[in-house]
Amino acid sequence: MNSKKEVQHVYLVGAKSLGAYGGYETFVYKLTEYHQNKENIKYHVACKANGDGCMDESKFDGVTKINDHEFEFHNAHCFKIDVPQIGPAQAIYYDVAALKACCEHIKKNHIPHPIVYIMACRIGPFASHFYREIHKLGGTVYLNPDGECEIIWATRQKPDFMR
């Protein structure tokens, strides 16, 4: 009997950083802090590399720098996404680039049955592409029901309050 537990890899997309910006960021910080000693869970956290709300890992104790765009914190692999300064479209760009990076990491490292958790769905029409890609890689996608797209992209119409 194999006593080695299989590691569950969980990719977190949608927070700009860990604990320094808002609700999603605090959630990710606390989640990784709580599970940092669990050997059977490995978190991979997308972080914004530049601009408003970007990740500044130098403000945290216990960070192990891997390179300019990757570090370990709370036993989580954190990777930074460069985002062009393109106004409100930054959020969409960031989520799409983060999901692309997750898929590349899963492929490159042959990660079995990964979980990708999207905290804020700002990817709209790109969602089905990434769902298919992640499912093809043997993964599961979870979308936060409090994300920002449920009505807009489900109906393809803007509610009255958004017109």
Language-model regions, residue ranges each:
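Nucleotide-sugar donor phosphate/pyrophosphate-binding loop at the beta->alpha transition
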Residues: 139-140, 150-163
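N-proximal low-complexity "stem/linker" segments adjacent to membrane-targeting elements
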Residues: 2-5
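A generic structural motif
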Residues: 38-44, 111-112, 138-139
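Local beta-strand N-terminus motif with an aromatic residue
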Residues: 7, 111-114
